[in-house]
Amino acid sequence: NIAAELEKNGVKILGTSPSVIDLAEDRDLFREMMDKLEIPMPESGMATTVEEALEIAGKIGYPVMVRPSYVLGGRGMEVVYDDDRFLNHAMECEADAISDGTHAFVPAVMEHIELAGVHSGDSACILPSVHISEENLETIKEYTRKIAEEMHVKGLMNMQYAIEDDKVYVLEANPRASRTVPLVSKVCNVRMVPLATQIITSELTGKPSPVPE
């Protein structure tokens, strides 16, 4: 969380810039970007007061998932129940990517074995997926590449999605390494951390981007 202050004081930040991290964490700005890319998201809103949150929840319909910005692993997230609709029976999945700011590589898509909205500490995933169709796998990879390239991510990125009624929705983007990187690296035989390190230090080393085709 100190990256922005360091940058303001002249410290060069390697990899993804603090402004891109802000873009991913600010729910309103991120939704604007998804609208621009024509990538669907569940209905949502951003509130700074209880009254605003109640108004947004009333428009969306219950149950709603409430979570703060700038947190890791679903910390502070709550599901508020009532009677209406949300992504009631959605399958959650995620994808890790390596990007050099212009091109992105998505080695795999992981399928969660619990429904969308479970805290990451209580979640588990499988790779390769069992229940995600080939069409949706390609859609997830395409969305991940588009978002990484639009945000000019440099290094690792994690995307979380939900699939309901055979439609893929973006839940959030995390322009950083995630807990699933070791799993993807091992299963796909892709050295993701060394590749990301080469990318974020390429300006210093002068070596070309190692993003795989």
Where is each model-derived feature located?
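ATP-dependent carboxylate activation and anion-phosphoryl transfer catalytic cores
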Residues: 11-15, 37, 60-63, 72-73, ...
